[in-house]
A protein has these predicted regions:
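N-terminal non-cleavable signal-anchor helices
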Residues: 7, 14-15, 28, 75-77
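Mixed-charge, Lys/Arg-enriched low-complexity segments
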Residues: 53-99
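Negatively charged, low-complexity tracts enriched in Asp/Glu with abundant Ser/Thr
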Residues: 1-19
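A generic structural micro-environment signature
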Residues: 12, 20, 32-34, 65-67
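A short, structured beta-strand/loop element
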Residues: 23-57
């Protein structure tokens, strides 16, 4: 079985370009017994099915990788926005994550 044929356990479309018919997905999948977290670009083929491209990143899904990714996103967002704005817009999400 090829990596691109592995069934997805979970995915969320985090960007969609309707004009180019391209999606960027955050994907959690399992390959050879290891869970992976991927950020990958998908395209719409001629049969109107979404297919993965080689463009993206893939890493083992473990607590440290997930924590570092979350911390990196918060840091990047905080450079553009104040802590107050982050808490106002993402406070409920952050609280739900730590229940």
């Amino acid at each position: 079985m090829e990596l691109h044929e592995v069934p997805e356990m979970y995915y969320k479309v985090i960007h969609y370009d309707e004009f180019k018919e391209v999606q960027v997905r955050l994907v959690v999948s399992t390959f050879r017994g290891v869970e992976y977290l991927s950020v990958r670009k998908y395209y719409l083929d001629f049969n109107e099915e979404w297919k993965p491209t080689p463009e993206g990143v893939n890493m083992p899904l473990d607590f440290n990788n997930a924590r570092e990714m979350f911390a990196g996103l918060v840091e990047i967002i905080s450079l553009a926005e104040s802590k107050e704005v982050i808490e106002e817009n993402f406070g409920d999400l952050i609280k739900d994550l730590y229940k």
